[in-house]
Amino acid sequence: MTTADFTQYKGFDLLIGGSPCQSLSIIQAHKRTNLNGKSKLFFEFVRALEEMKPKYFLFENVASMNEESKQVISELLGCQPVKINSNSFVAQDRPRYYWTNIPFERIVPPESPTTLKGIMQNGVPEKYFYNFPLEEIDMNRKVCTHMKHNNLEMHRRVYNPDFKVGCLTAVCGGNQQRKVLDGGRARKLTPVEYERLQGLPDNYTSSVCDGQRYKTIGNGWTVDVIAYIFKSLTNS
């Protein structure tokens, strides 16, 4: 990408992108290098924008970035972002910044009533369940319990099906997938449930293995959010 000649695509109507957020997110705060590291690909998006000169553009990144990074991006893209949480549409908390010149309604919809219970599959195979003992269960909390095993706290969290799940991340395995309490037992969310949490059709990613499905979906955008932003284009 750093050597691509974007002028050959000049005249396209729409440019979309989202550079890797690893060096912007608070999840990686201890490694933060602002707009360097993997996130420096943002500057390639800027170059593409300048060389292609599309009618519209959309750039997405994490809402947990620091103010310095946010202002640099805003200055180079020539607009301020709108913060949209996917929980306005799906059963996932996923706050993101969106920079765009698309003239859409910037009043963010309220949080939707959809919870994990509304997207969970029935008859989930045993391979998705864990046999680790659980800490005390509190059904009044979003994270209602933790699995008892030696791992990072965030990987031991078990979500209450009556709430929304935390942000999906790009993981392949190692018990890092989001977990839910199902029939008194902890299990990882299935790939289909991940798809539903991003607004994708069931089995949309079924052509690849589970590990790649989790990673791809966690790296993606929430379909409903993008549709909300794009809906004004149908009248343009």
Language model regions located:
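Conserved active-site and SAM-binding loop architecture
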Residues: 1-236
